[in-house]
Amino acid sequence: MQTHEIRRRFLDHFVKAGHTEVPSASLILDDPNLLFVNAGMVQFVPFFLGQQTPPYPRATSVQKCVRTLDIENVGITTRHNTFFQMAGNFSFGDYFKRDAIKHAWALLTSSVDDGGYGFDPERIWVTVYLDDDDARDIWRDEVGVPESRIQRRGMADNYWSMGIPGPCGPCSEIYYDRGPEYGKEGGPEADEDRYIEIWNLVFMQNERGLGISKDNFEILGPLPKQNIDTGMGVERVAFLLQGVDNVYETDLVRPVIAKAEELSGRKYGAVHDDDVRFRVIADHARTAAMLIADGVNPGNDGRGYVLRRLLRRIVRSAKLLGADKPSMREFITVVRDTMAPSYPVLDTDFGRIETVAVGEETAFLKTLTSGSKLFEGAAESVKASGKSTIGGDQAFALHDTYGFPIDLTLEMAAEAGLTVDEEGFRTLMAEQRQRAKDDAQARKHAHADLTVYKELLDRGPTEFTGFHELVSEAHVLALISQGQRVPVATAGQDVEVILDRSPLYAEAGGQIADLGTLTGPGLRVKVNDVQKIAKKLWVHKVTVQEGQLTEGDVVLAQVDAAWRKGATQGHSGTHMVHAALRQVLGPNAVQAGSLNKPGYLRFDFSWQGALTEAQKQDIEVVANEAVAADYSVNTFVTDLDKAKSMGAMALFGENYGDEVRVVEIGGPFSMELCGGTHVGSSSQIGNVTLLGEQSVGSGVRRVEAYVGLDSYRYLAKERALLAGLSSSLKVPSEEVPARVEALVERLRVAEKELEQTRAQAVLAAAGTFVDKAQRVGPVLLVADSAPAGVGGNDLRGLVTDIRGRFGTQPAVVALLGDVDGKVPFVVAVNKAAQELGLAAGDLVKGFGPKIGGRGGGKADMAQGSGSDTSGIAAALDAVRGQVADKVGSQ
């Protein structure tokens, strides 16, 4: 029975039993705590937790799942897979144990003709929780499974919970006995290689309390509603019904291995190490294709890094199998052909899937070739010294120089029988990050001695008051000039000022610093920039305009209100654009960087390939609809875990403290961890106008936008431009695009006609040159200056035409042009002249130096260019001389 039919029979069985068929959820849910969907019940969690009312009392689905915790074990055994399909039936307070058990038994044991799978009931074993007599009684007394094939297990095996307080309950697992050739007797307790688990029935009947482990937590009591959550492994059922030993030999996976056999010339099942690589390719190609289809792009962290790792393992496995050319396209194509009947997106979106996968392959092949040589040298050196550990410095060099991720180095080391000093590697990585931070600080502070800032940090952080006020009274704690503390600064001096408190925003999180002033009696100081030291100390870079600023002064620190308003519009606009991107493109459009300043924003995000015009328009519409909705903007401080559980967006790789600030715009529309300043409501952002979109690196795109008055000014210019075009073209503005397109087409046709006319005029001169041909021995020679301004393809075409007019007579044509002070030249020698020993390439070498140039080519045609027009006559004489020397006596 084919896998597609297994899926279909499952769904049909439960639809007939009153269940609503629900499509598989995306592998990517908008949940910061879940890397990938890894179970069939994930999309139904809000129903099980009582957070939402289910629209149906019972449901069935086949959910695509990805688990990557044991990715390094994939291929080594036949039991590990990263991608699998979980078929399930679910009841939300409707039926319970009896119906769940009977539904499963009916589907498994009914004949194929009756819509079932036709499993032999005598080979089915079940397990139940230790004291779940209800389930035991149903299996034994109502279904008819003898007690000898029912085993009781404890909480670790047969009691389910989500790992946190919430629904929980006993479960009953269904196993199939493959026979004595696969292991010893005794049921699942004795041998889970022989007895394969195919279905797990979870009876959610209790509420879990706190606990410290999977099998040690408090059960608080019964739930008000009892639910059912089951999961049947589609691939496991497939290999049992197809009579093969494991998932890798089923109809959906074996074709990928077959393609790898074809490309490598090796056979699956012959050599263990090769088999590992075949299985890695087969598993990872399926997973990678499904992840890309759901919007994941290769990246350096989070989901993107998992995808990158999968693709790179495919590339390396193919190379180790001996594939002599890139193979990713071939593997992805097989995945499409086998799985698209169940997942049509693999077909409809194949172009993008292929582009992403092949792009990563192309980039990694360069890294793999160069990095592998360094690794092999390091491994040989370690073995030669009698040691077994590759040093952290060597692993760091692989990462730093060749981009080798540490997991690849670990994998290669294990294959070579070696280990890696991971602690040493991570120490060097930490040192590199610290150096980068120090360098950044040094650049911001003109490479000053940071000791002075450390002394000030030890006295405590700057109090930032700018969230609540734009003017604050502050004490001048220190003045710094060229890295040294100074007691006073006078008019005209540029210094750095440290205050005990400040309303001026220090550059951070993509938002540039506030502008403002420091004032006092007879004192006016312009604040040009504000930077942070160690995220705690505000360093104000200022120019003293009037008076004298002294350490210990009390000043009024004031933000430029217009500047701040524009900056908050830009920053809040960035959040709106981020939310709109994710709404249009999906949750994988994750922030990779940003810049916000008054009236303008720039946002970098992870994405593969250019956005379409329709996507850009949709993003702009979504953002402006949110602006028009006048959403309230709320900020609050909470702990990091709670913020993430609420769905707040956090940047991968960013270090957050225990407490974080959350900026929420319109409830669920946008919620991000952010320390920046923002508007009070979304309508204060004003219009959002996207300016364009471009690539800024591998897998990273950038959008730019104007907001507020800058957006209106931009649109006013665009409107004026359109009005001008409308007036010039004498058509209504809505007809301008069509009229411009028509004019461009007319111009294209005219240019083509002009080019044809010009080419014909050039070729018309061919007859004149033929008439002027000189006879040198048996050869007809044209050695002359080309018509004025003729060069490039025109010159080549003219020379070719002249040569052709001589027919079978031996002929040499050499024309030199004069175009903008350059001397293009082309020499053509026909076959008859070549038989006399003449070659175009030899001729250009002879006369090239006369015009300060060089050229090259083959015997029939050669060309080049010189820079000395005064040497044209001498060069032509040289051509005549070379031909005469070669054939003059013949």
From Swiss-Prot:
EC assignment: 6.1.1.7
Entry binding sites for Zn(2+): 571, 575, 674, 678
CDD domains, per the entry: AlaRS_core
GO BP: alanyl-tRNA aminoacylation
Keywords: Aminoacyl-tRNA synthetase, ATP-binding, Cytoplasm, Ligase, Metal-binding, Nucleotide-binding, Protein biosynthesis, RNA-binding, tRNA-binding, Zinc
Source organism of the structure: Rhodococcus jostii (strain RHA1)
ATP-binding as UniProt keyword: yes
Catalytic reaction list: tRNA(Ala) + L-alanine + ATP = L-alanyl-tRNA(Ala) + AMP + diphosphate
Cofactor mode of binding and number, as noted: Binds 1 zinc ion per subunit.
Record lineage: Bacteria, Bacillati, Actinomycetota, Actinomycetes, Mycobacteriales
UniProt GO MF annotations: alanine-tRNA ligase activity; aminoacyl-tRNA deacylase activity; ATP binding; tRNA binding; zinc ion binding
Major subcellular location class: cytoplasm
Pfam family, one: DHHA1
Co-factor(s): Zn(2+)
Domain notes: Consists of three domains; the N-terminal catalytic domain, the editing domain and the C-terminal C-Ala domain. The editing domain removes incorrectly charged amino acids, while the C-Ala domain, along with tRNA(Ala), serves as a bridge to cooperatively bring together the editing and aminoacylation centers thus stimulating deacylation of misacylated tRNAs.
Protein name, per record: Alanine--tRNA ligase
Known function: Catalyzes the attachment of alanine to tRNA(Ala) in a two-step reaction: alanine is first activated by ATP to form Ala-AMP and then transferred to the acceptor end of tRNA(Ala). Also edits incorrectly charged Ser-tRNA(Ala) and Gly-tRNA(Ala) via its editing domain.
